[in-house]
Swiss-Prot record:
Gene: bglH
Gene Ontology annotations of biological process type: cellulose catabolic process
Keyword Secreted among record annotations: yes
UniProt protein name: Probable beta-glucosidase H
Catalysis performed (reactions): Hydrolysis of terminal, non-reducing beta-D-glucosyl residues with release of beta-D-glucose
Enzyme class: hydrolase
GO cellular component: extracellular region
Role according to the record: Beta-glucosidases are one of a number of cellulolytic enzymes involved in the degradation of cellulosic biomass. Catalyzes the last step releasing glucose from the inhibitory cellobiose.
Molecular functions per Gene Ontology: beta-glucosidase activity
Lineage: Eukaryota, Fungi, Dikarya, Ascomycota, Pezizomycotina
Subcellular location: Secreted
Pfam families to which the protein is assigned, alphabetical: Fn3-like (PF14310), Glyco_hydro_3 (PF00933), Glyco_hydro_3_C (PF01915), PA14 (PF07691)
Family: Belongs to the glycosyl hydrolase 3 family.
Predominant location: secreted
Length: 829
């Protein structure tokens, strides 16, 4: 915490150069400081599910929370508030004043690369979860920068794509989560998106800023996404306060020239500088640590475990196969995710965790006397797993010259694995635009045989083992999707190795600009990156046979697989909803011999196809669960946690069923949001398409009974007076548990095309066995309103409305109704 300063005094005292310097960052994470006026540098930090700190490379470890869709699946305001507090506390430990989150874009397609970062396909649920996590974070003094405003709902050509969306869909679906934040949370900062909306980049569009500041009366600091500023004059005049990161590419001396040419007014510079100073004045009072460090307290671990367990969705549980008993003679654990948990997606969400609990280790804790058989069954990785536990004495040395020339060592950095991102790395004397590095280390395999190696790079790289070249990813390169869409495909090589023998590995690396690969529409963060992975070469058919044998011999089988950050990441979208190759075949083969005693655990941030689902008795959706992934899953499997989570998005049976299937790529620089307002369950219900699992679905180990009648008061609704819907619920099952009652509103008499029904409220209710409660859910003016494109206002239409209480969007258990006597138009929040 620094000394306070008076914004007016500083603004009136500083030079024009200082005012201009305030409008852009100084480096990857910090704003400009004016020490003589007590204006400190403000530190920002990623990411949506954790706090990385200031380093992508060799960073300080951090708490990794479950991913956005997992948080959304809790439908738990209080738990999200606690998650926000933890994120704020992590920021303070890292010396950061501003958390770059949460992400509240919409999953209009299950294929969006960052779909796992956002909370839900429904704007009400998304906005409500965002409100809770923001208020939690900002209660610590840390400012939340909600993102990405607006329309960055897919990664394909995200900097260049023109999102073509109707005003109604923009308002009702994509802007509404931000509108809820503006009304209920007032986060101190907002980040713009990379993309265009209807012909103009959001960052340069005055109309998009007017919605925030004039219509919603919300005045956050507005910053660009990283390298998401494209002009000097247009972005300044439109309303962008802060260009990130620094050093500036479009401000600085360019602003001076624009002012001299009277293309930017002095008053505009003063307005933007004032906003940055107000941001700094507030943020600097957060009690941030002077030294970047971690915390990893027992209470943090307990909270993370609670969040993970409460996020896990029980999709299917025929004949109450779950929960499993804790007295089991022999259990088979199958799948690479059993020992290598998927704790997060890729990109900004990826960080160095304090620790990661595997399902294997968690089950050993629960079943200390049980014989446990483990088989991989099939690989789920896209890139070979990074070398870590078999790596020793590894360092990276940095130079300004390539390896074939005489060169001067600039720095030496110890590393504990063979993956690195250097977008924000710097050391004295380093030429950031063009440099080279050498990674040296010792690799001691634990099994003899043929080992596969894979090398992916943003830049150039060559792998040597005992000075023999094994992979050349320098001479000829093929573009892939890694490293925010700028990397190569994985080039592979193989070498016969002996267990226990130590081999010298060496990677000769050239920074980003040594690569000839160019790409349109992706973000060029610079620096470069590389990923070296290794795995014992295995016969895939024999792996399946071994898994089948284990399942046939065990009393129970847990098959845990899915996606990971190789498949779901910032920088690219998925091409399909498929699980990794051979996974479906593995699951089918295991179900053939042990279907009556097998539980399928899927880890993914968004839906995957499950062609075997009708044959599986029990299916669990475990998302990306953070540090406590293994514990969270085991808690649900063995009944220590009664599952209560609900899907925050619809789960289509086939990728071709999803509403954005024909419009999920940038074509000719444009992407048509052809589904309009019919996103997610709104689409499936409108056309009568059955999903594999509906929005809001999730089972429990207990039973609930809800009174069939909803009492609505008052029965005549106006936009000035919210109404209340009251219903009774009882836990009629054998154990305590929670049910999430979802309130949908339908407008059957409306002359305007509308969804069959829309989520407008919810309540998570915890009940002991036999306990009964009265639940009251409030409904506000959003429930009866749609965006009138002719009047350019919200319209609450006269008519009869139905209140539908469901345990999912498909399972409606109670009904009521109310009327709106008079049509009303309104604006604002």
């Amino acid at each position: 915490m620094t000394a306070k300063f008076d914004v007016d005094h500083v603004l009136n005292s500083i030079s024009e150069d200082d005012k201009i310097a305030l409008l852009s960052g100084t480096d990857f994470w910090h704003t400009y400081s004016i020490p003589e006026h007590n204006v400190p540098p403000i530190r920002t930090t990623d990411g949506p599910n954790g706090v990385r700190g200031t380093k992508f490379f060799a960073g300080v470890p951090a708490a990794c929370l479950p991913c956005g869709t997992a948080l959304g699946a809790t439908w738990d305001r209080d738990l999200l508030h606690k998650a926000g507090v933890l994120l704020g506390q992590e920021c303070l430990a890292k010396g950061a004043h501003c958390w770059l989150g949460p992400t509240i874009n919409m999953q209009r397609s299950p294929l969006g690369g960052r779909g796992f970062e956002s909370f839900a396909e429904d704007p009400h649920l998304s906005g409500t979860m965002a409100k809770s996590i923001i208020l939690g974070c900002e209660s610590t003094g840390v400012i939340s920068a909600v993102k990405h405003y607006v329309g960055n709902d897919q990664e394909h050509e995200r900097r260049a794509v023109d999102v073509m969306v109707t005003p109604r869909a923009l308002r009702e679906i994509y802007l509404r989560p931000f509108q809820i934040v503006a009304r209920d949370a007032h986060s101190g900062a907002l980040m713009t998106s990379y993309n265009k909306i209807n012909g103009k980049h959001v960052v340069e569009n005055p109309a998009m800023y007017d919605i925030i500041r004039k219509e919603w009366k919300w005045d956050p600091l507005i910053m660009s996404d990283w390298l998401g500023t494209y002009t000097t004059i247009d972005s300044l005049n439109a309303g962008l306060d802060l260009e990130m990161p620094g050093p500036s590419r479009y401000r600085g001396k360019y602003i001076e020239s624009a002012v001299q040419a009277r293309l930017v007014k002095q008053s505009t510079i003063d307005q933007r500088a004032r906003k940055v100073l107000e941001f700094a004045a507030r943020a600097s009072q957060a009690p941030a640590s002077a030294v970047e460090s971690g915390r990893d307290y027992p209470e943090d671990r307990a909270l993370n475990r609670e969040i993970c367990g409460n996020s896990i969705v029980l999709l299917k549980n025929e004949d109450t196969l779950l929960p499993l008993p804790k007295k089991i003679k022999k259990i088979a654990l199958i799948g690479s995710h059993v020992k290598t948990p998927a704790i997060s997606g890729g990109g900004s969400a990826s960080l160095q965790p304090y620790y990661a609990v595997s399902l294997y280790d968690a089950i050993i804790e629960v079943l200390p006397d049980t014989e446990i058989i483990y088989e991989t069954g099939a690989y789920a990785h896209k890139m070979l797993p990074v070398i870590d536990r078999m790596l020793s004495n590894a360092v990276i040395r940095f130079y300004n010259e390539p390896a074939d020339k005489e060169r001067t060592l600039l720095s030496t950095e110890p590393v504990n694995n063979t993956a690195f991102q250097l977008m924000d790395y710097n050391t004295p004397g380093l030429n950031r635009t063009l440099f080279w590095a050498t990674l040296d280390g010792e690799f001691t395999p634990d099994v003899s045989g043929l080992w596969d190696f894979g090398l992916t790079v943003f830049g150039t790289a060559t792998l040597y083992i005992d000075d023999e070249m094994v992979i050349d990813n320098t001479t000829q390169q093929t573009r892939g999707t890694a490293f925010f869409g700028k990397g190569t495909i994985q080039e592979v090589g193989a070498k016969e190795l002996t267990a226990g023998r130590t081999y010298k590995i060496r990677i000769e690396f050239g920074s980003a600009n040594t690569s000839p690969i160019k790409a349109i529409g992706v973000v060029h963060f610079g620096g470069g990156a590389a990923h070296l992975g290794a795995f014992l070469h295995m016969d895939p058919e024999q792996m399946v046979r071994d898994a089948v044998k284990a399942a046939s011999e065990a009393d129970y089988t847990i098959l845990c697989t899915g996606l990971n950050r190789d498949w779901e990441s910032e920088g690219f979208d998925r091409p399909d909803m498929d699980l990794p190759p051979r996974i479906d075949a593995l699951i089918s083969a295991v179900l053939d011999v042990a279907g009556d005693k097998t539980i399928i655990v899927n880890q993914s941030g968004t839906p995957v196809m499950m062609p075997w689902s009708d044959r599986a008795r029990a299916i669990i959706q475990a998302w990306y669960g953070g540090n406590e992934t293994g514990h969270g899953i085991a808690d649900v499997l063995f009944g220590d946690v009664n599952p209560c989570a609900k899907l925050p998005l619809s789960w289509p049976a086939d990728v071709r069923h999803n509403p954005a299937y024909l419009n999920s790529l940038s074509v000719g620089g444009r992407m048509l949001y052809g589904e309009d307002i019919y996103v997610g369950y709104r689409f499936y219900e409108k056309i009568g398409q059955v999903t594999l699992f509906p929005f809001g679905h999730g089972l429990s180990y207990t039973l609930f009974e809800v009174s069939p009648k909803v009492t609505v008061s008052p029965t005549a609704f106006t936009v000035e007076t919210p109404l209340s819907a009251t219903v009774r619920i009882k836990n009629t099952g054998p154990v305590a548990g929670a049910q999430i009652l979802q309130l949908y509103v339908a407008a059957p008499t409306s002359a305007t095309p509308r969804p069959v029904k829309e989520l407008q409220g919810f309540s998570k209710v915890f009940l002991q066995s036999g306990e009964e409660k009265t639940v009251v859910i409030s409904v506000d003016k959003y429930a009866t309103s749609f965006w009138d494109g002719i009047e350019d206002m919200w319209k609450s239409e006269a008519g009869v409305y139905q209140v539908l209480i469901g345990t999912s969007s498909q399972d409606i258990v109670a009904r009521g109704e109310f009327t709106v006597d008079e049509t009303t138009f309104w604006t604002g929040v």
